[in-house]
């Protein structure tokens, strides 16, 4: 999707559920639901430049409007970014464009810094560059709070822009993406070297990193089905990365990891974020026809499926306890099973009727 990537295992045409529910950013939700593994990365993931970090590019989990999308609605964006590119000196704030989305949502409780940000943005309906609004950390923190509250919109370089530069996504004109890619490529790492030689190189780097994160999420979901921990999987992935960084001599050890069975990729960025493109992972991917609208179409035609489980325990020989709101004891297993099934049937019929069922 645009903001997240969700991975689920399908068995007999249904997603597998679990009592502990989904896993979001490595944390179990502890709510009985589909066992989905979710990572905050997608076509609209915000790419942030971190000049003092070992890794100067951070991708996700927050989102931003892709430059190609924002430029279609706000023509001044390309003009602003082009002026930044024409300067000989790069700034950390280059390539970030902001506008007011919904000032009404936050009328009270604003700090002075937030008031100042909204006042500046209010003077330009189409939006302004980050540098023109805030040049210090206090102002940038205020902007981040307003973005989080949905008051201020942000556009910056995203994987969607990278896909447009490389020609794997052709939905929008690439002008804004190309300028944004050049601005990002000329930023410096902590050693003073440009991040990339040009916009093509930075775009390829961004998409490769996103594909790797998608692949690792798929592997995590597969490992979870095999009752392997993320720690065990991470050791293999760590060794694979270390080997990939070795240069100057051939590798004697071949490290390959993948998934048994096919992986179906759906969502608008499926083709551009397919993790099997470079052959690094042993994953057999399938991209269905109309994959771009599969999520929306599935939601529109999807059926409602309700499930209930009732536990029957045996505290001692010959005693069978059916665990409902109030546990009931039986001395015959078949009678206990029959009662449990009848209780579940009545509950499901009632809930399906409330959900709109007409023949429950």
Residue spans for each PLM region:
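N-terminally biased helix-coil "hinge/interface" segments that flank
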Residues: 1-360
